[in-house]
């Protein structure tokens, strides 16, 4: 019983610490300008970086 409780707490803590899944869709890019439109649709903010040919969207504020 005690081991199951600890495992449950570990799972809950892990899911709380993981980043939001918003913007998890893979967006292919070549330049940061390619990320502005798709990032605006996903996060409401056009801020994004093109890293390893995938967009990484940032949130505003």
Swiss-Prot record:
GO terms for molecular function: ion channel inhibitor activity; potassium channel regulator activity; toxin activity. The modification Cysteine amide is found at residue 60. Disulfide bonds join 29-50, 35-55, 39-57, 45-60. It is found in: Secreted. Pfam families: Toxin_2. Has the structural arrangement of an alpha-helix connected to antiparallel beta-sheets by disulfide bonds (CS-alpha/beta). Blocker of voltage-gated potassium channels. Belongs to the short scorpion toxin superfamily. Potassium channel inhibitor family. Alpha-KTx 06 subfamily. This is Potassium channel toxin alpha-KTx 6.6. It comes from Opistophthalmus carinatus.
